[in-house]
């Protein structure tokens, strides 16, 4: 299975450039075109958070306008720049999010691999953290018998990357 990952798109309302100089909308449009034209075909796309730069609902709508051009199905999880409330509103029509509660989590078995999208965000904090409730959900999900390989995707790395300014924002309890 060919799977593509998009992350940290940092889309802003009104298609504004991020950080005063980065045209994230054009970059995402280019990525979508590349994925659609890639051969052999990409079978699914995972988007691992920081979809927006400031969490605004309008920015999520701009993201949707662009990402809806993807040919393969796509799956999203939030990052620390995303408002959970606006995330849920923007993606309420996504069937795989229908059972999410206070955090965004789901398992999709529609592909040759099982995809588990997992929310590691802490509202208004740069780092990630796994609550007991989230860990229990993940344990139960992983305990379900399947013959498929499982791919877990989330925003925060569960280990140090060696990039100092990023490692202070990683998953605090990633060893769990």
Question: Which residues does each predicted region cover?
Answer:
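Hydrophobic beta-strand anchors of alpha/beta hydrolase catalytic cores
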Residues: 3, 45, 115, 150-151
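Extended active-site neighborhood of metal-dependent phosphoesterases/phosphodiesterases
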Residues: 57-144, 149, 171-176
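Surface-exposed cleft-lining segments at the edges of enzyme active sites
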Residues: 17, 51, 121-132, 159-168
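Active-site glycine-centered loops adjacent to acidic/histidine catalytic or metal-binding residues
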Residues: 8, 49-50, 79, 118, ...
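N-terminal active-site segment of His-dependent metallophosphoesterases
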Residues: 1-62
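Short acidic, glycine-rich surface-loop motifs adjacent to enzyme active sites
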Residues: 145-162
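Short, solvent-exposed loop/turn segments at secondary-structure junctions
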Residues: 9-11, 82-83, 121-123, 157-159
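Class I (Rossmann-like) S-adenosyl-L-methionine-dependent methyltransferase catalytic domain
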Residues: 12, 19, 94-95, 160
């Amino acid at each position: 299975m060919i799977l593509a990952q998009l992350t940290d798109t940092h889309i802003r309302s009104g298609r504004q450039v991020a950080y005063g100089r980065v045209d994230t909308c054009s970059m995402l449009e280019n990525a979508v075109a590349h994925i659609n034209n890639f051969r052999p075909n990409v079978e699914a796309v995972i988007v691992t958070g920081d979809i927006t730069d400031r969490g605004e609902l309008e920015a999520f709508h701009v993201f949707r306008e662009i990402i809806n051009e993807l040919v393969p199905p796509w799956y999203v999880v939030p990052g620390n720049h995303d408002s959970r409330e606006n995330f849920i509103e923007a993606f309420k029509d996504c069937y795989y999010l229908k059972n999410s509660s206070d955090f965004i989590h789901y398992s999709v078995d529609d592909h040759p691999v099982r995809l588990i999208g997992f929310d590691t965000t802490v509202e208004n904090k740069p780092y990630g953290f796994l609550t007991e409730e989230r860990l229990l959900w993940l344990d139960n999900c992983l305990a379900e018998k399947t013959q498929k390989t499982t791919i877990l995707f989330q925003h925060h790395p569960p280990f140090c990357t060696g990039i100092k300014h990023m490692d202070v924002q990683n998953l605090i309890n990633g060893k769990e």
